[in-house]
From Swiss-Prot:
Function summary: PPIases accelerate the folding of proteins. It catalyzes the cis-trans isomerization of proline imidic peptide bonds in oligopeptides. Promotes salt tolerance, probably by maintaining the Na(+)/K(+) ratio and good photosynthetic state. May also be involved in the regulation of abscisic acid (ABA) and Ca(2+) signaling pathways.
Pfam families: Pro_isomerase
Main location: membrane
Additional record remark: The cv. Suxie No.1 (SX1) is more tolerant to salt stress than the cv. Tianlong No.1 (TL1).
Any single biological process term in GO: positive regulation of response to salt stress
Domain of life: Eukaryota
Protein name: Peptidyl-prolyl cis-trans isomerase 2
Protein location: Cell membrane; Nucleus
Keywords from the named record: Cell membrane, Chaperone, Isomerase, Membrane, Nucleus, Rotamase, Stress response
Example of a GO cellular component annotation carried by this entry: cytoplasm
Regulation: Binds cyclosporin A (CsA). CsA mediates some of its effects via an inhibitory action on PPIase.
Reactions this protein catalyses: [protein]-peptidylproline (omega=180) = [protein]-peptidylproline (omega=0)
UniProt record similarity statement: Belongs to the cyclophilin-type PPIase family.
Length: 172
């Protein structure tokens, strides 16, 4: 089976910014890819927090130019929340794939075995994250949109304008 492809339709400051299409490495990280895929479709319904297990309407709360764009906290919206389809947190599946350059999709965490729903898209090679964060996909279309998101970021991670996943889902 080919790897699934999912999308984010993004807005920046309330204006449509375009679509990011990501291939998920279900062949290498099946559990991590499935978590992200299901959070894109929203098919699992509400989570333990009572909020839908869905990226739709969530924001990229932390954007650092020449590093990464982080999102996926659909419970608190500020980097303190998020929830996986497996319950609150799940284990690091493996570290087979590396942070090789722009467009790499990886799980944000707060230490070993603390994966939830937060993720980041690299805007450069981040090899120091290898073995600490699970790489589970890559951007295949829309790196121009990622670059636009990067432009509203700052060294502190705070965004100058809201960056929102207006819609999301699965393409294949």
């Amino acid at each position: 089976m080919p790897n699934p492809k999912v999308f984010f339709d993004m807005t920046i400051g309330g204006q449509p910014a375009g679509r990011i299409v990501m291939e998920l490495y279900a062949d290498v990280t099946p559990s991590t890819a499935e978590n992200f895929r299901a959070l894109c479709t929203g098919e699992k319904g509400a989570g333990r927090s009572g909020k839908p297990l869905h990226y739709k309407g969530s924001s990229f709360h932390r954007v650092i130019p020449n590093f990464m764009c982080q999102g996926g906290d659909f419970t608190a919206g500020n980097g303190t929340g998020g929830e996986s389809i497996y319950g609150a947190k799940f284990a690091d599946e493996n570290f087979v794939k590396k942070h090789t350059g722009p467009g790499i999709l990886s799980m944000a965490n707060a230490g070993p075995g603390t994966n939830g729903s937060q993720f980041f898209i690299c805007t450069t090679k981040t090899e120091w994250l290898d073995g600490k964060h699970v790489v589970f996909g890559q951007v295949v279309e829309g790196m121009d949109v990622v670059k636009e998101i990067e432009k509203v970021g700052s060294s502190s991670g705070r965004t100058a304008k809201p960056v929102v996943v207006a819609d999301c889902g699965q393409l294949s």
